[in-house]
């Protein structure tokens, strides 16, 4: 089969298409013929050798490696101990995350059955492949954590904030993968949502349900709003601290990419800073699939590239200002 692999770390140019054997499913797994692959930040973290992560949190892996965690496709075979899936089923999933051995940049992939859900009938493989990591991240931050695994970023267990009418939420990076799902999930629960993105994304985010919009290229969001119940910062990192001043006492800041925070400052302000690491979860993905199927949620596609052009997809990601998701398509013989 064809697969894109990393033989060394570096820029997009190190992504190389190879011929490799079709993998064999082990216990609890299915073999999936891949139709489309979602491109996610961990793909380029892996490509560049995890240089953005502290050494103690870097997962272990050996080269060559097939990157990728998100996919949508059709079940080819199932292991004898697998119930719930059969050959011919259309499925989608976030595979083996937070490990980095999903291996979805390929024509075939083995997948733990527990990581999969049936693909919503109302969307195609491209849109389904764009959903798993981003939608599960938004779900586990905002709706239900769904596991008891400790976070590498904090000692306390992450607890979502109750959302409902009257809850004031700001989503930073609202046009991106996680951000556009977070906006929609908050609106699904009746929250009042302010979306932060560059100005060209305003019509798109208004269409998704944003009540207010801040163009960060013209106005500083941390100076534009106050008394928020929750900030979901899909950009995260060191810049998240600026949002502390936007929260009311009892409010919460959820940075998707964790940064450094002063415990004394958050205690003085009476706010909570919390995050988690998304994990594969087929049951939660099935719930998200129902929302995708009935139109409550939609997947925005920024651009598509064929599998052999994975390098171009990573180059597109590096340019930023992504609206929704980048997806690789896999030709079917």
Segments from the language model and where they lie:
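Glycine-rich beta-strand-centered segment in the early N-terminal region that forms part
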Residues: 21-38, 51-97
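Short glycine/proline-centered loop/turn elements that form peptide/ligand docking sites
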Residues: 80-81, 99, 193-204, 237-240
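A structural motif shared across PLP-dependent enzymes of the aminotransferase-like
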Residues: 98-113
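Mid-domain Rossmann-like dinucleotide-binding core that forms the NAD(H)/NADP(H) cofactor-binding site
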Residues: 128-215
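A short acidic, Gly/Pro-enriched loop at the edge of an enzyme's catalytic core
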Residues: 223-230
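Glycine-rich phosphate-binding loop and adjacent beta-alpha segment
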Residues: 234-300, 329-333
